[in-house]
Amino acid sequence: MLGKPEDGEDQKLFDGLEYDYILWLDNDVIFSPSDFDKLYKEDKDVMSGLYLMSDNTHFAAVELWDEEYFQSNGSFEFLHKKDIGTRLLPFKVEYVGFGFLLVKKGVFEQISYPWFEPTYLEIKDCKDFSMEDVTLCLKLSKLNIPIHVHPEVVVGHYKQIEMRI
C-alpha cells in the first residue's frame, strides 16, 4: 500500500498504480457479497458498513463529534442499535471504525502522507491517545470529504471473550 519513502509526504498509494476502490476489512468481520455490493452501489467517496463493538450494543461509528459529550463521558457517543432502526438510507458520520470500509480512488490522493498515524487528542481537560482510524477520519473532515454509513449493511463482528474470577 505504501509508496516510496524517498517521496516523503508526496507518497502515492500503491506506488501510483491504478485502482478503483480499496476495501478495509478486519479479520474478525463476517460479511456477504451483497454487503459489499450495497456499499459499492452507493458510489460515495467513503462508505462503511456497521458492526457492533464488544458491548454488543453500540456500533463503531460516531455521528456527531461532540467534544462536550466527550469531556463529560470520556468517550464519544457511538451509534446505538436504536439509532439505525428507522433509517433506510446511508447517512453521514464523523467517525467510523475501519472494519468494513470502502474508499474510492481520489480520496487518498488528497491526503498528505502519512495517511495513518496515532493521534494524541486534547479536548479541553481530557487527553486521549487515539489510533489511526481516528486520525484518518479527522483528516477527511478537514478536507470536507464526508464519511457515510449504510444502515442496511450490518456485518458480523466475531469476538471471543475470556471471563475470569
Range-by-range predicted roles:
Residues 30, 54-55, 155, 163:
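Surface-exposed, flexible loop/turn segments at secondary-structure boundaries
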Residues 105-106, 110-165:
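C-terminal catalytic/acceptor-binding lobe
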Residues 25-27, 50-52, 152-153:
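Active-site-proximal beta-strand/loop segments in catalytic clefts of secreted hydrolases
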Residues 8-30:
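Short beta-strand-to-loop acidic/aromatic patch adjacent to the donor-nucleotide binding site
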Residues 32-120:
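Conserved catalytic core of nucleotide-sugar-dependent glycosyltransferases
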Residues 1-15, 137-138:
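Short, conserved alpha-helix that lines the donor NDP-sugar binding/gating region
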